[in-house]
């Protein structure tokens, strides 16, 4: 008799995705981040749901409702900080996941990769709108600055910004709609993640060597279920250390001041996970140019498969490309640091150089290094 997990219509889907799935025998811990992102998403949806039960999306009460959650709701403080820091963990996992994809050439799975890029944009949009909800100073001014970027679009820009605001400034209408979008988007992300997984399971996972692993597969369960559980425990440990010991480490003190349209904070900056893109935006002295650079800094991921000139898929056996990859990582860390600094010398020039370096590495240096490595193989 066939086991129920192989015959039941629903169980069969789960079985083929998480139990009897043939997986490469050599995938490293860099392949853990997919499941960790799933855990982050579930955690964010659950904590967000409980926060939404007590939050009010009105400009007059939003700030005090968050204070009420922290001060009066049973365990409200831990739910709030798990949600805020959960977003940081989400982005750490996200950047590691994308970095893994770049290093090991996973972007050759086109559908999986493209849906992944769409997911990245959606998560970034969700996080941005979530940051506006507590209605502190940085919430308000962050929303004002970022939405205002759309006014750089020729002809329709100003109308577009006012349409998004629902008025002539960031106000009640903006906060209400941001809350509505922030609530719905995670469910869209969950649906996209399932499609992401569906396309991945069409091809099977990549592995560190980049060579086909069809001849050497092992079942996902128990080997990778136990590995994912270890990853999950480490993720939760890191999150809870952050939440319980330094919950405000990654936040901005300005957000503990209620939003005031008449008083601009000295340094407007987004959360840490957007600083690299913010630095690229600021490094161009033209508004439209900056906005384009900002969008392209992430949209560039879409063309990664076109920039792959190597005869090998993975960077495992390509020392030149490895070197450039880690320079790119260092460059992104530099941009993250610059994004949090004031706009003054020497930060301006460092930001501009790091921005040029970012695009130069991806568009020119890495494809060139790959071609050189191809020629070295002939020797």
Swiss-Prot record:
Bilayer-crossing regions: 33-53, 77-98, 113-133, 178-198, 226-246, 288-308, 320-340, 347-367
Record text on cofactor binding: Binds 2 heme b groups non-covalently.
Record-linked SUPFAM superfamilies: a domain/subunit of cytochrome bc1 complex (Ubiquinol-cytochrome c reductase) (SSF81648), Transmembrane di-heme cytochromes (SSF81342)
GO molecular function: metal ion binding; ubiquinol-cytochrome-c reductase activity
Protein localization: Mitochondrion inner membrane
Cellular component, GO annotation: mitochondrial inner membrane; respiratory chain complex III
Keyword Secreted: no
Binding site for a ubiquinone: 201
Database matches in Pfam families: Cytochrom_B_C, Cytochrome_B
Binding site for heme b b562: 83, 182
Binding locations of heme b b566: 97, 196
One Gene Ontology term from the biological process aspect of the record: mitochondrial electron transport, ubiquinol to cytochrome c
InterPro entries assigned: Cyt_b/b6_C (IPR005798), Cyt_b/b6_C_sf (IPR036150), Cyt_b/b6_N (IPR005797), Cytb/b6-like_sf (IPR027387), Cytochrome_b (IPR030689), Cytochrome_b_C_euk/bac (IPR048260), Cytochrome_b_N_euk/bac (IPR048259), Di-haem_cyt_TM (IPR016174)
Membrane protein topology class: Multi-pass membrane protein
Cofactor: heme b
Keyword terms: Electron transport, Heme, Iron, Membrane, Metal-binding, Mitochondrion, Mitochondrion inner membrane, Respiratory chain, Transmembrane, Transmembrane helix, Transport, Ubiquinone
Keyword Transport attached: yes
Subunit structure: The cytochrome bc1 complex contains 11 subunits: 3 respiratory subunits (MT-CYB, CYC1 and UQCRFS1), 2 core proteins (UQCRC1 and UQCRC2) and 6 low-molecular weight proteins (UQCRH/QCR6, UQCRB/QCR7, UQCRQ/QCR8, UQCR10/QCR9, UQCR11/QCR10 and a cleavage product of UQCRFS1). This cytochrome bc1 complex then forms a dimer.
Function, as annotated: Component of the ubiquinol-cytochrome c reductase complex (complex III or cytochrome b-c1 complex) that is part of the mitochondrial respiratory chain. The b-c1 complex mediates electron transfer from ubiquinol to cytochrome c. Contributes to the generation of a proton gradient across the mitochondrial membrane that is then used for ATP synthesis.
Further information: Heme 1 (or BL or b562) is low-potential and absorbs at about 562 nm, and heme 2 (or BH or b566) is high-potential and absorbs at about 566 nm.
Family that this chain belongs to: Belongs to the cytochrome b family.
UniProt-recorded name of the protein: Cytochrome b
Organism lineage string: Eukaryota, Metazoa, Chordata, Craniata, Vertebrata
């Amino acid at each position: 008799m066939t086991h129920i997990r192989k015959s039941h219509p629903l169980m069969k889907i789960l079985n083929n995705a998480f139990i009897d799935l043939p997986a490469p025998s050599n995938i490293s811990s860099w392949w853990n981040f997919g499941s960790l992102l799933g855990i982050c998403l579930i955690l964010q949806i659950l904590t967000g749901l409980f926060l939404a039960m007590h939050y009010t999306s009105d400009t007059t009460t939003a700030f005090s409702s968050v204070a009420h959650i922290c001060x009066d709701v049973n365990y409200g403080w831990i739910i709030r900080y798990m949600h805020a820091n959960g977003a940081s963990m989400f982005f750490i996992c996200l950047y590691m996941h994308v970095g893994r994809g770049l290093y090991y050439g996973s972007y050759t799975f086109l559908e999986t990769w493209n849906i992944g890029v769409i997911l990245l944009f959606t998560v970034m949009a969700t996080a941005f709108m979530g940051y506006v909800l507590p209605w502190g100073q940085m919430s308000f001014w962050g929303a004002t600055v970022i939405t205002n970027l759309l006014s750089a679009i020729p002809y329709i820009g100003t109308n577009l910004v006012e349409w998004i605001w629902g008025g002539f400034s960031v106000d009640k209408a903006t906060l209400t709609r941001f809350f509505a979008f922030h609530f719905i988007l995670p469910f869209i992300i969950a649906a996209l993640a399932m499609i992401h997984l569906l396309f991945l399971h069409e091809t099977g996972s990549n592995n560190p060597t980049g060579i086909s692993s069809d001849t050497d597969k092992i079942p996902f369960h128990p080997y990778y279920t136990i590995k994912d559980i270890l990853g999950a425990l480490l993720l939760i440990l890191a999150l809870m250390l952050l939440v319980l010991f330094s919950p405000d480490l990654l936040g901005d003190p300005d957000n503990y001041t209620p939003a005031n349209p008449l008083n601009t904070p000295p340094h407007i900056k987004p959360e840490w996970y957007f600083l690299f893109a913010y630095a690229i935006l600021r490094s161009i002295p033209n508004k439209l140019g900056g906005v384009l650079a900002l969008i392209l800094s992430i949209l560039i991921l879409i063309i990664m498969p076109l920039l792959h000139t190597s005869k090998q898929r993975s960077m495992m056996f390509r020392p030149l490309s490895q070197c450039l990859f880690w320079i790119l990582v260092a460059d992104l860390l530099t941009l993250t640091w610059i994004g949090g600094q004031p706009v003054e010398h020497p930060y301006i020039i460092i930001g501009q150089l790091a921005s040029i370096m970012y695009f130069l590495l991806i568009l020119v240096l890495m494809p060139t290094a790959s071609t050189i490595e191809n020629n070295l193989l002939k020797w």
